[in-house]
Amino acid sequence: MDESELFKGLMNSTAYCSELAKVDIPFYKSIDTEFNENIKSVSSRFMRLIELLLSKVDRSRAEDIVDVEDIDNRWAEVSDTLDILFEKADYSIDKAQGLLKKPAIETHASTSDVANKKPKKEKLPYKVIHAAHLTKPQLRFRVQPNNSREFVWSWKLTEKPHSLVPLEKIIAQVKLDPSLKNSLPHPYEPEIQNSVYPPWVSEMSNPIDTGSVDETEPIWVSTESQLSDMLKELQNSKEIAVDLEHHDYRSFRGFVCLMQISNREKDWIVDTLELREELEALNVVFTNPNIIKVFHGATMDIIWLQRDFGLYVVNLFDTYYATKVLGFEGHGLAFLLQKYCDYDADKRYQMADWRIRPLPREMLKYAQSDTHYLLYIWDHLRNELISKSAERKENLMQSVFNSSKQISLRKYELEPYDPIYGLGTDGWRNVLTKFGSSKIIGREALMIYRALHDWRDSVARKEDESVRYVLPNRLLIAIAASKPVEAADVFSISKQLTPIARMYVEDIVKVVQEAEKLYNEQVDREKSQFKEVEKQNQPLAVFSESNTLGDYKVDSSVFEISKQNRSKLKTLLANGSAFWIEGQSQDDLRKARKERLFIVNQNIPFSLTLPCTQGHVESELNVKQSTVTEAANPSLNGEKKQEPIVIRDLGLNKQKRDSSKLNHKEPSNPIEERNEDIEPSEASTSVSKKRKQKKKKKNSGKLTIEAEHVSNDSPIINEAPFDYKNQKNFIADLDSDVGKNKFGKRGFNPLNKVSLPKRNTRELKKRKVSDGKSTSY
């Protein structure tokens, strides 16, 4: 089989698997035995192939995989192994075809090929993505960030332009209600809720072309005078486009590095690192209800504006929600730029480090393009919303505005660290669920993991670094699972330790050791508590050698309240029934019972405690060496010994009783004749016997398969090669002539869609466009 046929078969298999995943497989397996057997055969084949694949890399890791659950739990290892093998195979194929050798004579592609193929973009240099040796800009901030867990955040707002409710009134309300200090109200909530959009927004208009981004030079704003000039022009605009570039990798809380603002004529790029404390002046424009502020994916932008600059937005239009209402295929800004402007945004710079100064021209142009075309896109979206509203007979424009209002009402609030329950975005519970559910096993590993997670958060706050920079989540899980004893063990876990982790490697080992010590102390404490409870919970012995009745007056009545018998009766019956004790309050009795817990013998689950009689006393005096049971239940005047009531035996299921005994009439006194009617051991014998036979029958098939498997020294490697080319497709056969009846018609095939998968490889490779802006750096 050559490379083209192999690739074709691989693509067909991928297509079938993609379609098969959409079908309710368990349902069809339950109604079609042939389909069930075929699925089992394919699954076992896949299992053996994966085991063979891993064995080529590491035999010890392959032996640990037994079933599908192991693959699910260790899919990261399987995926990494596949990536390594694919890269090596790709490299070997290129080398065999001579693609890696530089040709002696340079060849030039035809003009048609050049026109059809886009040039492949190289990866950005590492220094552009992470400027490791850059001095932290936050060290130059006039107000240093406070990362402590006890810090209470407050508004940065000092004045409130375009207000319906004055700022002083809101501050007075917070002072009167202390509960509002933990969750401050939105200062512009009344203005946002009561905002009315200008009438011209609902009118159709021709989109205003802003020209190419290459034809317009952005204006860099880094001084107060430049900021003032920009404000004057923005106040005369009807609509503006705004975007932010954020960084949160080398900072605990993160900060905004750039702000891009555009109107119909100009593009501004504001250096927010230099003008951090002066940008509150933009509220004059941002809170003006007569100026429409166009954002794309403003969910986080609104939060960052409040946190860093004290800025709030009134009359926001989020183009992301317009794409949702219109039902577009994509919802990202790159999709809109391609759809309306035929502009291919270089998304490599999404991951760039925007702290770099001065900015390279490529990064500057990328930042400018985010807002340069946004007002032109807003014109197109507005026209489509108006036209679609007439077709659907609903106000789609108002729907987008309502969603945008909810985004404007978002508030910035600090997320507290929760060491107990691990709640929150970066809480230990969320990280454990995503990355360590299969690796952190046992109470000790969990305690070490939680201690390391707490330590990571503390160091990140202290060094003003993100938790990902201090200790990535996967490395955190790996350290907690391996339980390093010394620094060398930590370095052996991963070769890519972060600089902070290398600097604090001794502290990491110390945290692990302290967590182990705490766990051992907790285990010892639980063992001692269990022993204490077990010691207190000894079966009650009313009469024993240590509890003799030598000083008890035998010839007197047991129930006679005399000075001689009073103390002895209290000693013997304090743990029995409070009814027989005179002169003690209910509180004293309750306290005595709590101090002395007792359990009934396990052979008698529920028993009735009876008062002592004179027969008990005489028996104890005559036979000192008798057992506890004989002392507590002696024969009385030759009468038949009375057994305690055992509720569990009387409550047995009728099917578990002897069938011959069920035909007899129920005895008048079930307590006395219980042992004659019911034999629990005999009743349960047949049930346990049936279970053993069933289990033996079930395991017989497994033992046969295992015996055959063990007989072969290397069943996977010695197996005959699988003929992929001539393999029968059982899904496609469901629509073949085999299934026709005598009238020449085929029956209903529920897997018809699966047998006709999409063969368009581009569609299979096409990635889903993400919703809006998810992460920024």
Curated annotation (Swiss-Prot):
Changing residue 243 to A: Causes slight growth defects and accumulation of 5.8S rRNA unprocessed at both the 5' and 3' ends. CDD domains: Rrp6p_like_exo. Pfam families: DNA_pol_A_exo1, HRDC, PMC2NT. Its EC number is 3.1.13.-. UMP binds at residues 245-246, 304, 347, 350. Residues 219-385 form the 3'-5' exonuclease domain. Coiled coil: none annotated. Residues 655-673 have a biased composition (Basic and acidic residues). Disulfide bonds: none annotated. Disruption phenotype: Severe growth defects at all temperatures. Accumulation of 5.8S rRNA unprocessed at both the 5' and 3' ends. Accumulation of a subset of mRNAs, such as early meiotic mRNAs targeted by mmi1 and iron homeostasis mRNAs, and non-coding RNAs. GO terms for cellular component: chromatin; cleavage body; exosome (RNase complex); heterochromatin island; nuclear exosome (RNase complex); nuclear exosome focus; nucleolar peripheral inclusion body; nucleolus. Residues 688-700 have a biased composition (Basic residues). Zn(2+) binds at residues 243, 245, 370. Residues 442-522 form the HRDC domain. SMART domains: 35EXOc, HRDC. GO terms for biological process: exonucleolytic trimming to generate mature 3'-end of 5.8S rRNA from tricistronic rRNA transcript (SSU-rRNA, 5.8S rRNA, LSU-rRNA); histone mRNA catabolic process; nonfunctional rRNA decay; nuclear mRNA surveillance of meiosis-specific transcripts; nuclear polyadenylation-dependent antisense transcript catabolic process; nuclear polyadenylation-dependent CUT catabolic process; nuclear polyadenylation-dependent mRNA catabolic process; nuclear polyadenylation-dependent rRNA catabolic process. Nuclear-specific catalytic component of the RNA exosome complex which has 3'->5' exoribonuclease activity and participates in a multitude of cellular RNA processing and degradation events. In the nucleus, the RNA exosome complex is involved in proper maturation of stable RNA species such as rRNA, snRNA and snoRNA, in the elimination of RNA processing by-products and non-coding 'pervasive' transcripts, such as antisense RNA species and cryptic unstable transcripts (CUTs), and of mRNAs with processing defects, thereby limiting or excluding their export to the cytoplasm. Component of the RNA exosome complex. Specifically part of the catalytically inactive RNA exosome core complex (Exo-9) which may associate with the catalytic subunits rrp6 and dis3 in cytoplasmic- and nuclear-specific RNA exosome complex forms. Exo-9 is formed by a hexameric base ring of RNase PH domain-containing subunits and a cap ring consisting of csl4, rrp4 and rrp40. rrp6 specifically is part of the nuclear form of the RNA exosome complex; the association appears to be mediated by Exo-9 and not by dis3. Belongs to the exosome component 10/RRP6 family. This is Exosome complex exonuclease rrp6. It comes from Schizosaccharomyces pombe (strain 972 / ATCC 24843). The gene is rrp6.
